């Protein structure tokens, strides 16, 4: 109630969770929220195994991650944008180095991880 349905899904989810928290329906510790994320991921894995309810369980994972972002005081929208920009940057680096279409996924993954390590060292 009171949360516009026209809001983007991440923001709508966060606002609904904030309203629930305002009346006491909330975890006290980050570890409890992380446990809920783990539980939802396990349910998604089960849904994938039986090829049923995948979309719903995926939504539950996203909802629980938005809740974790709220607990960590992270804006999920800007966090996702930042990760997307980071992915694009790393992918472009790989494209400069190799002909992606000629390598196996395993070879590309190795290069990806090398670039990731390089990026982490530069932080």
Predicted segments, located by residue:
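Flexible "arm" and connector segments at domain edges
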Residues: 1-58, 62-123
């Amino acid at each position: 109630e009171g949360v516009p349905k026209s809001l983007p899904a991440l923001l709508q989810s966060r606002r609904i969770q904030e309203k629930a928290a305002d009346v006491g329906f909330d975890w006290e510790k980050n570890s409890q929220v992380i446990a809920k994320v783990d539980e939802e991921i396990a349910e998604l894995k089960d849904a994938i195994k039986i090829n049923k309810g995948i979309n719903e369980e995926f939504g539950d994972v996203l909802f629980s991650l938005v809740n974790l972002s709220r607990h960590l005081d992270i804006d999920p929208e800007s966090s996702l944008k930042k990760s997307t920009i980071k992915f694009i940057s790393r992918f472009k680096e790989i494209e400069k180095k190799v002909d992606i279409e000629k390598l196996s996924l395993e070879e590309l993954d190795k290069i990806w991880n090398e670039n990731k390590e390089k990026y982490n060292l530069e932080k």
